[in-house]
């Protein structure tokens, strides 16, 4: 019985390292991760060696920093896929794709921002190197703009300030570089019911993103579609935007939004 308790305690201690990486905004050095988990660096290293073998943690060979590994990503995505909102959305995507003939994706808010949790490619050729688990920027992606527009400001404030500073430093003209401009853009997203980018995230790519709300009025997920400017209607309320928003609105209703 004592051994059983010790074994469980050992798992709990090791899990504190995974929690530290989950809360972090990026990869961590050993000493910082150990400190976040409340243990010595030597003790943390022993756990991390095992976690690396299991794929729960990865280490950058160049920087020596630790981050969540592919197995942790798979666990997180599997859990998210079991959420009712994501499951229902996945069931609706084939019909929407048949209607608009474009690539579709689902995103939820993760600990580092809007995260792609499902991806369905169309037969249309799209030069978009996006993968499950990718985190989308708030300002230059339709997905990010949708989340920034509908989440509470305190949730996105840190990431938004970082991206504004980066855009200003780079001298970008296709995204906001100050808070006032960002707020105006996000107000337009809320007014139109969807977010759109053209050539902003990827050259020659257009994307729309529509929000899905739960019964409590909170943003549950976002539905994104993207395609080449050659085959994708970029018009507001056009052949892509309208059915995308309609699908998102129906899904919100099925989740109980607006019925209270």
PLM ranges: what are they?
Residues 57-59, 106-107, 212:
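A structural signal for short hydrophobic beta-strand segments in well-ordered beta-sheet cores
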Residues 77-125, 150-153, 185:
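All-alpha effector-binding/dimerization core of bacterial HTH-type transcriptional repressors
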Residues 174-248:
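Extended hydrophobic
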